[in-house]
Structure formats: structure tokens, C-alpha cells
Amino acid sequence: MNLYRLELKRVCKTRMTAILLAIALVLAVVMAYLPVTFIGWTELDASGNKVSYTGLKAIRKRQEQQVFGTITPDVMQEALEAYQRVYRQYDASSINDIPVEVFYKELARYQPLVNNAKEAFADPKTGMAPGVMGLTAEDMQNFYSQLPKRLESVIWLEQSGKPGYEQAQAIAQKKFDAVQKPFTYSFGVSPDAMDYQTLLSLLLTLLCAVIAAPVFASDAQTGAQDIQLCTKNGGLRLAAAKLAAAFSITGAAYLLCGVVWILVTNALFGWESTQTSVQWLFSVTSLLPYTVGQMEWVMLVANFLIFFAEVAFVLMASVWAKNNLTALSVALISVVAPLIVYMVVPGSFGEWLSTLIPAGGIGLSNALLYKMIGFDFLYAGGYAFFQADVLLASAPIKIVLLVGLAAWGYLRKTRVA
């Protein structure tokens, strides 16, 4: 315990660690606030002039006129009728033909509902969504019964022809059956906000990788490790203390910043929106059985598992590195490696590789969030595996394996010494 406290104090007292932790906390607040600036609202004032709002003011304006609560087929029909009435009034063929102030006054509250209805009734062979005037009141009454059919067509469009396609279809339908219907909705947290949670996870991983990289390598660079390895407690006990201290500091920083992001985001957008079904944010056939609020916490915990696996890899690299530069280079490359593999290596091999390397699931377009809301499957031996499930199931295995390799590598140095 004394070694652990000393190592914790040593790492925390370095100027670089303090700076990086401060940057991480600032990033958490900034990443929560930026999506707020994307929200807009336009209306006419008492004189008939257009007045536009952005940010918090726009959010409050939208919330004053929103549709909220359980979205029943009757509410869906009400939304369609409002849209079609305005479309006829302005002889519109698309939303661009509607005056901006009319859109915000008459239609903005119904937009998520109508957009999801268009997606639900998209052509099963082409995926093309119908226009507003192509939908009927009967369609709205059948909205929820249409969703399994839409899911089946989406899986067919994206996965047909692959070995194990039928199993992928069955997995998707089983997951979607667990989604609570009818959906609930309240304007607030946006898809952009969830994107920024993913970006924050990537940035925090980069910062914490920089903190963890020198934990062992700095002693190797200065020669202090040669002395430590010859002491009574310089073997496994010291290695365990260093590993525990590094995990404690980076883990606490990640969780603190993640919680700050959630609290600030919900305070800005409104806590009511945490009850919104995630299907309104991403896709009407998203397989996740969560509300937005639940999704925020699920993503924090899920990304934390992957983050821990990456930190374990960085610490293993630090054990074998002879100087800080080597350890830092390996750490930074390993964080972005899944994104590079995802973009460069084609086919099933690239998908498996980007999933199984330590930081798999951390990144941008390859991030865990998009695997959870999408329909990405991995195939092997005629079997299909939901990629998000593989990412989460493999993370604890990676952690145990990499921590074990780090300890083994340090013990090998002890024997040599």
C-alpha cells in the first residue's frame, strides 16, 4: 500500500499530468456545450420581422412548443396531418418550399415524428423514403407494426449475400423485440451531443495514454529501473503499485470527465429529454432498448471498459520501452490504430482486426456508439456476431491479458537483473 501511495503521488505531482488532467476536465465541459450552439429557432416578432435564436434560447423556444410524452399512433397521425395541411397550403414538394418562420411555428415540433415515419415506410428494395404526401393516416396507425418489416429490409439491404446473413437477421429481430414501444419523446439532447460524447472519449483516451506511457519507461530511460529491480520490493510489488496507480489516475480522470459531460449536457438540454427513446435520435430501427439518459450512462461504462483495455496496452508498451519517446509513440499510434485499420484494411479481416486490437471501439466513424446504433456484423465460420457485442465482450479479456503481459514483462527484467 505504501508503494501504491508513493507511486500515485509521484505521477500526480508531475507537471504534465496536472496539465493533461486540467485539459481533460475543460474538454468535458466544452464538448457538452458545443452541441447546444447548433440548435436554432426562427419566429416572427410583434412587428412581423424574423427573429432567430441559437443555443439555450433556441432550446427553450423549441421546448415550449414540443410534442412530448408517449408517441401513440394517434400522435403520429396528428403530425402527418399538420405537415400535409401546410404542404397543401404552400403547394410544397419538400420542406425547403415552406417559409422558415412557418416551419418553426407549425411543423418543427412534429419533424422527428414525420422523419421517422418516412424512414419506417421506405421502399424495402431501394431504401428510398416516401415524401410527406405519400404517407397516409392508415400508415401512421400502423407505424409500430411496420417497424419489424423495416428492420428486416434494412438487414437485407446491408447484409444479404454474406455467410450467416440469416443469423444476423435473427439477432437483429431479437434485439429489436426488447425495445419498448410505443416510443417516448421530449425535445432536448441531440444526436450531435452523443457524437461529442464519442469524440470526448477519444480525446480522453489520447490524454490518458500520454499520462500512462512514461509510468515504466521513464525509469528505464533514467536508469532508475536498474536500481529498483535489485531491491527487495522492486519486482512484482513495485510493478503492481505502478499498474494500480496508473489505472487509478487515468480511470478516475476518465470517469470524472464522463460524468461531468453527462451532467452538463442534461442541464443544458433539459433533464426531461433523458426519457426520449434513442430511436428518435438515430434510426427508427435502432436495436438499443434505452432512453437517451440510459444511453449516456451505458456509453460511459462501455467506453470505459475499452478505455481500460487501451491503458493496459499502453502500460504493457511502457514496460518494454527503453525511453519515454518510444512509449509515447506506441501509445498514440495504438489509440488511433482502430480508425486507421477501419479506413485502410478492407473486408472481414479489417473489421475483425479493428475490433480486436486494444482500442477497438474508440475513434470516430469506427466508434462503439455507431456500432451499437448501426447494423454492423462480423462473420466467421458461417456465424454472425453483432460487432458491438464483440467489442464489449472482448474488452475484459484484453484487460486481463494485457495486464498479465505487462507484469510478466516486468518480472522478466527482474530475473535478468
Enumerate the language-model features and the residues they cover.
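Secretory targeting signals
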Residues: 26-78, 82, 139-219, 240-320, ...
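Juxtamembrane non-transmembrane "cap" segments at the membrane-aqueous interface
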Residues: 268-277, 346-372
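Alpha-helical transmembrane segments of multi-pass membrane transporters/translocases
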Residues: 17-20, 306-314, 371-417
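Short helix-to-coil transition segments within interhelical loops
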Residues: 229-235
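Central hydrophobic cores of alpha-helical transmembrane segments
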Residues: 21-25, 325-338
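Aromatic- and glycine-rich beta-strand/loop motifs that create alpha-glucan
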Residues: 1-21
